[in-house]
């Protein structure tokens, strides 16, 4: 295959799309942080009823790293910042056991260079048992705290 870069645009996702890939929305929220412009996700009310309230939990993460967003029960708007400054920022996720939120926080940390502390990370094995080994192959670095 040949891969070429192009102008990346913000995501505009409707409820119709949500039905077929709702588990990927936390990751799309994370990626949207670095896209220029405003990404809009509509019809996402069911995210509040997953292993955690994924709208609320991703909002907490976005707030920690200084990403502007608007969230309601059925919509999320993320004001992306491709020039995000990482100094003095850290992603902390604790008290939840949602594998999708934990994976999305880890990937956001890798994309931005922001350090993260993710408790209950073993929950990632629920949907992706090889997640850490895959990240290691992609030059990610994780340290386990005791």
Question: What feature does the model see in each segment?
Answer:
Residues 1-146:
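Short, structured segments at the rim of ligand-binding sites
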């Amino acid at each position: 295959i040949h891969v070429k870069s192009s102008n990346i645009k913000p995501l505009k996702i409707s409820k119709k799309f949500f039905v077929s890939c709702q588990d990927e929305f936390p990751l799309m929220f994370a990626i949207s942080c670095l896209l220029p412009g405003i990404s809009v996700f509509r019809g996402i009310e069911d995210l509040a009823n997953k292993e955690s309230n994924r709208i609320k939990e991703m909002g907490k993460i976005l707030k920690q790293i200084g990403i502007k967003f608007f969230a309601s029960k059925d919509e999320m708007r993320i004001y992306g910042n491709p020039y995000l400054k990482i100094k003095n920022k850290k992603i902390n996720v604790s008290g939840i056991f949602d594998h999708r939120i934990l994976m999305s926080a880890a990937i956001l940390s890798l994309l931005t260079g922001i350090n993260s502390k993710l408790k209950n990370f073993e929950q990632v094995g629920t949907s992706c048992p090889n997640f850490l080994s895959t990240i290691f192959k992609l030059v990610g670095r994780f340290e386990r705290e005791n």
